[in-house]
């Protein structure tokens, strides 16, 4: 049993963490203070009257109203993450056998959520494959038309705002316009955008937005947000016949503990940091420009419109063939320099993000990688 005692994290706090799924989830000091107050089990339920979204101490009810305004949506509910939000929407508004039309870069959880809800999936393909993997957004019309011509019902349109593979930002307005023309509900998966960059739900004509607290809103896992328009409120918030105060799709209550507290405590920090998105893009583009000088090749759309970067790295792969550490040399060399978050043993392609780092740290990372390549050649 000793292995469960005194747990520590091997990626220490002193390391610069480049993992794209973690850069947006780093807690500010305000949230760390809240952890101490609320780390016990059902601590948010001290003054609960039956439903999480109506709790006023801590101010969960106010927070959900504020987050809805922040996203320019009508309503919001806490979830355990974006994946749970997607399933809630699919289960609440679609009928078994309906089709979900989604982009080819959609996260695996979009497919799994549809499968769990007993729905079918139709993909919208690429305008271009390698190296940009840009989605053909106008292709949504064609896919929907083809399905309808075959007598199939499309219950939901889903667009991945930014995908987790290439970091491509999709023009949600285009798909929102198509959704309105077709009269089909539109879900925007903002796991990589809400909390990192500005998102305006009504501007892009989204009926639903799902967000990830732990991925992009400086919160502890698992937590997220489902924001939705008033038009679909009755379906999303339908209550149980036997337990009338409990919302069915939320199974009564969702993120009922420390994660939602960190989400709230980080909210003022998040509101301010999205205003600095242009500066984050400058850092990202600087990294791309500098590392392409030494043989890296950025995959995905150029110039970068999001902080998640995927590189082809043939120069690292060539070094790995000669180095006795093989593919682990790059991870080892980064670790020596206080840098983590890059997958160990992988040298053909890497993903990274410098979101939220100071310029001095960004320059340090770039110079460290250049030094590694030069010294290990």
UniProtKB/Swiss-Prot annotation:
Subunit annotation: Homodimer. Interacts with SepRS.
Protein name: O-phospho-L-seryl-tRNA:Cys-tRNA synthase
Function, in words: Converts O-phospho-L-seryl-tRNA(Cys) (Sep-tRNA(Cys)) to L-cysteinyl-tRNA(Cys) (Cys-tRNA(Cys)).
Substrates-to-products reaction catalysed: O-phospho-L-seryl-tRNA(Cys) + hydrogen sulfide + H(+) = L-cysteinyl-tRNA(Cys) + phosphate
Domain of life: Archaea
Organism expressing this protein natively: Methanocaldococcus jannaschii (strain ATCC 43067 / DSM 2661 / JAL-1 / JCM 10045 / NBRC 100440)
The protein's required cofactors: pyridoxal 5'-phosphate
Family: Belongs to the SepCysS family.
